[in-house]
Curated annotation (Swiss-Prot):
UniProtKB keywords: Aspartyl protease, Glycoprotein, Hydrolase, Protease, Secreted
Positions in coiled-coil regions: none
Top EC category: hydrolase
Glycosylation sites: 4, 20
Lineage: Eukaryota, Metazoa, Chordata, Craniata, Vertebrata
The protein, known as: Pregnancy-associated glycoprotein 67A
Domain of life (superkingdom): Eukaryota
One GO term (biological process): proteolysis
An example Gene Ontology CC term for this record: extracellular region
This enzyme's EC code(s): 3.4.23.-
Amino acid sequence: RGSNLTHPLRNIGDLFYVGN
């Protein structure tokens, strides 16, 4: 998603949980 700018870890976790 677009949470990489504010929360890189959140974005990475989101990729694993949601799958992009």
